[in-house]
Amino acid sequence: TLVDSMIHDGLWDVYNDIHMGNTGEVVSEEFSISREGMDAFAAQSQQRAATAQAEGWFDWEMIPVQVPQRRSDPVTVDADEGVRGDTTEESLARLPPVFDREGKVTAGNASTLNDGAAAVLVADADLAAEMGWDIIAEIVDQTTSGVAPERVMAAPIPAVRTLLERQGLDVLDVDVYEHNEAFAAASCAVAQDLGIPNDRFNLHGGAVSLGHPLGASGARCLITMIGAMRRIDAKSGIVTLCLGGGNAVAMLVRRS
């Protein structure tokens, strides 16, 4: 028997014996997220990412990779290949649901499965100064949260709320937010429940457009957020993402 290791190891809720896509349906129902709202968010993600690519806003965070070819010169990959700036709400509306025949999650409003890698270097400020490293942001605080496994897509909400409360902050005290767009339904729920304005949320697109390479998305989201902060000269940002099993993490960073 052939087993898809991506689904078996990374995309299956072993507690409820369901695909992670079904948890996108769960969060859409719990927070009354419409299919139209999900498609609108997904189209926005594609368009924001396409703009960021065209304007070179991703360049500082990307490392070009040479890919050997069997019978030709190596190919240089220096941009995420899944971004589709011509995506519209109308084109997304034509796609059928994937995980539930009566559901709302489609291939267009879910994150794409991508190969990718990301890394960050975390260091003591004194060591960074000694080594001559540029400090791009300071970690202020971080939190974790846990909910029922089938509600995993909602787990970032208590993580962010705890982080704000612990720091004595209101939502609008933070300049930029970055949420891993595992499903558009999840991002819509997080922004809606926390009251995050659209012009502070996932400014350069997210996993719906850029992809969700499992294990790399945490670092990728953090750096993409810092890139957006650099572009608009924002001073503070919160990045958050859910984890299999019903957990989530959130981190507050600050630029000087």
Ranges and model annotations:
Residues 22-25, 61, 69-71, 140-209:
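Active-site pocket-lining segment
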Residues 171, 188-193, 197-202, 207-250:
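Internal helix-turn-beta structural module
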Residues 28-57, 119-126, 213-234, 252-253:
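Active-site-proximal alpha-helical scaffold in enzymes
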Residues 27-34, 39-41, 102-112, 143, ...:
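Cysteine-centered functional microenvironments
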